[in-house]
Amino acid sequence: MIIIVTGGAGFIGSNFIFHMLRKYPDYRIACLDKLTYAGNLSTLAPVMDNPNFRFVKLDICDREGVYRLFEEEHPDMVVNFAAESHVDRSIENPEVFLQTNILGTQVLMDACRKYGIRRYHQVSTDEVYGDLPLDRPDLFFTEETPIHTSSPYSASKASADLLVLAYHRTYGLPVTISRCSNNYGPYHFPEKLIPLMIANALNNKPLPVYGTGENVRDWLYVEDHCKAIDLILHNGRVGEVYNIGGHNEMRNIDIVKIICKALGKPESLITYVTDRKGHDMRYAIDPTKIHRELGWLPETKFADGIQKTIEWYLDNREWWETIISGEYRDYYEKMYGNR
């Protein structure tokens, strides 16, 4: 089995590659990644010497380069993690999100049509559904929930999903889509809530929390997400969307306080900053379909997952300190410095 994994130097993509090579040592994985600010080649160090792994620096919008890779690898499957994914950045510069997330997806699907594949899988997000009210804890996103995007990021991901489904109906392309809740775990880029709070707390820096911190997210440990995608790839029904959720709803402010307590840091580090434009209030996924059809359930309780995540950041300071000392530092000052 040969699988092309796009965006494999990023957070979820790299964890998926590690999972697949551990579970299927005879599979071959070709990883392509543009290596933007969030793609870190050092993340893939554990598999660089694996004879069944290949890395190619490539933009999914580069049609000629993508076609060349398909000709060389003859993939059976393609899993698309490649995406611009940070909401704040999409508000500052929507164009790059539309380019990568929509047009890049089109290039990949055209390559799949041209060269033939057994499965194309699109990794999407629960953010395409919009948000849920805080006073209705009985409501959850299902696969039938209408798309109702709130940011340029979520609009670009929803557009890509619709394009994937259109290619399935129009051209018969064998596709599946997964929409997941917020992930956390090793190798998470420090612009996102949990790694940002861990890194700042370890450096005794302010912990910037949007608004009042009441926003609720459903948290999914990244390894559980990878196992779900594995199941969908091998056993999911073509043309279907599967929601993947962690059954771990938490307020942002509670997450930050948990991290402070785990690291022995004072809550006085918490600094409330001007809220994000159009900030969604609550995300909550109903994963009944993937459980019913494929037997998947999240295995990691949040208390265990956050502890493992904190320990990973303690043990791998060099990885994230290199990141926050570079271009990211300027971005951080722009986003939080005057709020």
Model-inferred region functions:
Residues 1-183, 308, 313-316, 322-339:
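N-terminal Rossmann-like NAD(P)+-binding domain of SDR-like oxidoreductases, especially those catalyzing
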Residues 3, 29, 58, 195, ...:
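C-terminal substrate-binding subdomain of Rossmann-fold SDR/epimerase-dehydratase oxidoreductases
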Residues 12, 38-39, 64, 188, ...:
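Residues that form or flank phosphate/diphosphate-binding pockets in enzymes
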Residues 35, 182-185, 215-216, 276-277:
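Short histidine/acidic/glycine/proline-rich micro-motifs that form metal-
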Residues 47, 135-136, 190-198, 274:
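A glycine/serine/threonine-rich, flexible loop-to-helix segment
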Residues 65, 96, 103, 146, ...:
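Residue-level recognition of oxygen-bearing side chains
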Residues 137, 149-156, 186, 190, ...:
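The catalytic Tyr-centered alpha-helix of NAD(P)H-dependent dehydrogenases
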Residues 159, 163, 167, 197, ...:
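Hydrophobic alpha-helix immediately C-terminal to the catalytic Tyr-X-X-X-Lys motif of short-chain
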